[in-house]
């Protein structure tokens, strides 16, 4: 999020970020090293790592999708990415998700006709819509991990479009964006980042924007 990158961070937000990342990493280490023990509470809420939520598809860019410049239309790329993300969220939740928003749309490089294009979508965060709408930055189980049967849950999906060239063995990320879906009810797994860098990235993309109105 470019706006977030330019915004100064309050000290209390900085402290909260450190605590949040530490908690994420503690839980993800358990999920990685001792998966059979990776539960959150007496309800046996499941834990999954971000890599376990990946869905992909691969296709050749066709001339039917070109724009006036002779390159693949950006709206087509967004639609294909959205369809993959929707299918991913549906598979993950077991109930049809509702679209909330698309953000952090980044067109980095053009896609040419004939390019081999891979779309990859994975979940980076699952939480309640108002999980951080509070006047305090205390790290609580209820705003980080707790799941429930009759509450709304937001599923945040990271989507990338990647041109892969088998001849040069050089993949290029051409597009990336975030999509948020919402589902109502059901006990969803908690999705955890697998590295400290990934945890910081999730905080900046998902958590910090929810706190930016407090500054």
Regions inferred by a protein language model and the residue ranges of each:
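HotDog/MaoC-like acyl-thioester-processing domains
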Residues: 1-24, 113, 124-215
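A cross-kingdom feature marking solvent-exposed beta-strand/loop segments within repeated
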Residues: 94-115, 129, 133
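Conserved positions in beta-strands of structured domains
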Residues: 103, 122-124
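Short coil/loop residues immediately preceding or within conserved phosphate-binding loops
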Residues: 68, 102, 154
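Catalytic strand-loop segment that frames the active site of acyl-thioester-processing enzymes
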Residues: 1-74, 87, 212-213
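Active-site helix/loop of acyl-thioester processing domains in fatty-acid/polyketide metabolism
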Residues: 73-95
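Beta-strand elements of modular eukaryotic interaction domains
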Residues: 46-49, 64, 89, 96, ...
């Amino acid at each position: 999020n470019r706006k977030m990158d330019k915004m100064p961070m309050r000290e209390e937000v900085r402290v909260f970020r450190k605590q949040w990342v530490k908690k994420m990493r503690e839980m993800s280490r358990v999920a990685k090293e001792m998966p059979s023990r990776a539960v959150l509470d007496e309800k046996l809420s499941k834990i999954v790592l971000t890599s376990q939520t990946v869905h992909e598809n691969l296709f050749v860019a066709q001339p039917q999708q070109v724009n006036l410049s002779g390159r693949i239309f950006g709206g087509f790329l967004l639609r294909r990415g959205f369809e993959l993300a929707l299918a991913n969220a549906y598979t993950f939740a077991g109930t049809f998700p509702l679209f909330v928003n698309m953000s952090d749309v980044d067109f980095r490089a053009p896609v040419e006709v004939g390019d081999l294009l891979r779309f990859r979508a994975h979940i980076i965060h699952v939480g309640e819509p108002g999980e951080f709408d509070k006047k305090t930055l205390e790290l609580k189980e209820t705003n980080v991990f707790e799941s429930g049967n009759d509450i709304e849950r937001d599923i945040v999906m990271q989507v990338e479009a990647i041109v892969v060239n088998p001849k040069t063995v050089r993949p290029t990320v051409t597009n990336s964006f975030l999509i948020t879906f919402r589902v109502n009810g059901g006990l969803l797994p908690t999705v955890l980042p697998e590295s400290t860098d990934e945890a910081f990235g999730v905080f900046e993309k998902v958590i910090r924007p929810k706190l930016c109105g407090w500054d």
